[in-house]
Amino acid sequence: MTSSMSNDSSELGMAKKRDHKIMITEEAINKIPRIKYRDIPESEYDNIWDLAKSVLKISKEENDSNEVAITYSLDSAKLIEQGERYIGIALGNEHDVDPLSDTTAYHLISSTEECVVIVLHNHPSLSDFSLTDVQFLLRYDNVKMMVVVTNLGSISYLVKGKKYDLKKAIALFNEAVDKNNEAEKLKDLQNAADYFLKNSYTVGIDYDNR
């Protein structure tokens, strides 16, 4: 990957705005929409809907409304048959979460064919996806989709489609960073992330928010 893409993700994460977090309510959990995700089997819609609710519930009940990431294998039926785990849960702090900090999630992302990573972000004033999120999606080939849920119950997602092109995606990522002062300041980080989201369709990544 090029130099911009190879920046340590923790550096990007540290530049995120330190807003006061929003405490999760039952109302936010109940308003999570059921989405017909592009390029994802219809049989998975309800599973992902349940997990999007779960990421809020876990954060509310077990992590003081801080960030949480759930990694879910789309090979779940096969893994269940084999008696293996198919969901990994990582608990983060107020500002970020590393999905790979959970050993099951790490194993799933390392070994299964396709995964979905569902992340709770609790700073609604930020872009729904951060550059760190985008970088994570591009870095791991078998992360098929990344879903961001906010503490207020809204959902956004990026999914790799049939025309997904990694080289073009990395070039777009670097272009987004270069066009925004190397993404050194908060506003630049947000603008770079927005630039990528706006143009993601050109590299075979579908973006939507609800």
Predicted regions and their residues:
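Acidic beta-strand-to-loop metal/phosphate-binding motif
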Residues: V116-H123
